[in-house]
Amino acid sequence: MKIAPRWQPTQHVEGRIDLNRDLIKHPLATFYVRVEGDSMKPRIHEGALLIMDRMVEATEGSIVIVRIGTDFMVKKLHLEQDGQIWLLSENEAYLPIQITEDMDFEVWGRVMNAIDFL
């Protein structure tokens, strides 16, 4: 029977984790957002902590925090060549949302990282 060699965590430690240094590029424009709901499952789970940067451009396929009226939501941004904007959920139980000119709509920031809790 083979036994794996004893692993010493200290042999692989690079140093202390500094989440501000490692995950935040624009401190004055970065916010943490806690996820409520399951529209982005299985990719993002309820309770996950999202790190959102307002200075990073949202591009096709970006996960974004958007505001429609007074409601904020996490969605995947889909930009069509004809200028149409769609907001997509990862969870197939939710229908896509087409953004129209009469909507009070804003991309509030781009999600850069998600911290999920086990």
Task: Give the positions of each predicted feature.
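Short, well-ordered loop/turn sites that connect or cap secondary structure elements
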Residues: 43-44, 58
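Well-ordered beta-strand positions in beta-sheet-rich domains
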Residues: 49, 74-76, 96-98
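Structural motif
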Residues: 47-49, 62
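Short, positionally conserved secondary-structure boundary motifs
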Residues: 1-40, 71-72, 95, 108, ...
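A structural micro-motif recognizing beta-strand termini
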Residues: 34-39, 53-55, 67, 90
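Glycine- and charge-enriched low-complexity intrinsically disordered segments
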Residues: 79-118
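Short, compositionally biased
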Residues: 38-41, 62-74, 78-85
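Short, hydrophobic/aromatic-rich segments at coil-to-beta transitions
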Residues: 30, 59-64
